[in-house]
Amino acid sequence: MKDYLVKALAFDGEVRAYSVRTTNMVSEAQRRHDTWRTASAALGRSLTAGAMMGAMLKGEQKLTIKVEGNGPIGPIVIDAHANGDVRGYVTNPHVDFESTEQGKLRVYQAVGTEGNVTVIKDIGMREPFIGQSPIVSGELGEDFTYYFAVSEQTPSSVGVGVLVNGDDSILAAGGFILQIMPGAQEETISFIEERLKKIPPVSTMIEKGLSPEGILNEILGEENVKVLETMDVQFNCTCSRERIESVLISLGKAELEQIRGEEEETEVHCHFCNERYKFSKDDIKQLIETL
């Protein structure tokens, strides 16, 4: 099944809802970064949240999420675009812990329970929107829920989950965001709160084959959900050799001459997708000649 995202309204507009399957996206991130199980879950949950938060934007808008906890994986950084392109990395991918007795990955131990979630939105204004909230659990779903409440004053429920196989490959990943709109009735809020207590983990629902629409129907009741739009989501990095060449050219002639004199081969590493671009002395010489 391919990855995709659903935007919906529920209860006659009282609830805005997003749901997404990100199994392939998280698998691609795991492959590129060689993340171990707990790091995969942390990165995958963050990518999933990023995909849904990106879908709240329009046109060419984009956002960056930084989860900076005091755990051993270090900062997690996600870039998400309104068109469904998402990329991201975790600073230390080789982090894993023993699962709990219930088989749950200890994501909070990897992320840490102190620190901040920062969201930077480039929405075409002169200055970006920057929102920040403290990490409350390190499990990420609760941390993004708290972010929406504190920074965007939007009562929300964020569920994100990743199931990882014994060989570190990704079995299932996805999530949902429910947002209560102004004027929502108490009955609606109570209904959702009760449903959220009863549903299985979102990653389990995806493993069992539920679609993003199926997840929203499971939580909100099929008769209450009105799907507005579906869109593809994918791990897609904007880096390329041409872009790296432009960055090198921007260093100027003197610095490029110095690099060429000191290095047999220059390597530039993209943190987001782990791609490495190599430039020989002749490559650098050709770049200098364009200046």
From Swiss-Prot:
<keyword id="KW-0862">Zinc</keyword>
<dbReference type="GO" id="GO:0042026">
    <property type="term" value="P:protein refolding"/>
</dbReference>
<comment type="similarity">
    <text>Belongs to the HSP33 family.</text>
</comment>
<dbReference type="InterPro" id="IPR000397">
    <property type="entry name" value="Heat_shock_Hsp33"/>
</dbReference>
<dbReference type="GO" id="GO:0044183">
    <property type="term" value="F:protein folding chaperone"/>
</dbReference>
<keyword id="KW-0676">Redox-active center</keyword>
<dbReference type="Pfam" id="PF01430">
    <property type="entry name" value="HSP33"/>
</dbReference>
<dbReference type="GO" id="GO:0005737">
    <property type="term" value="C:cytoplasm"/>
</dbReference>
<keyword id="KW-1015">Disulfide bond</keyword>
<dbReference type="InterPro" id="IPR016154">
    <property type="entry name" value="Heat_shock_Hsp33_C"/>
</dbReference>
<dbReference type="InterPro" id="IPR016153">
    <property type="entry name" value="Heat_shock_Hsp33_N"/>
</dbReference>
<protein>
    <recommendedName>
        <fullName>33 kDa chaperonin</fullName>
    </recommendedName>
</protein>
<dbReference type="GO" id="GO:0051082">
    <property type="term" value="F:unfolded protein binding"/>
</dbReference>
<keyword id="KW-0963">Cytoplasm</keyword>
<feature type="disulfide bond" description="Redox-active">
    <location>
        <begin position="237"/>
        <end position="239"/>
    </location>
</feature>
<feature type="disulfide bond" description="Redox-active">
    <location>
        <begin position="270"/>
        <end position="273"/>
    </location>
</feature>
<keyword id="KW-0143">Chaperone</keyword>
<comment type="function">
    <text>Redox regulated molecular chaperone. Protects both thermally unfolding and oxidatively damaged proteins from irreversible aggregation. Plays an important role in the bacterial defense system toward oxidative stress.</text>
</comment>
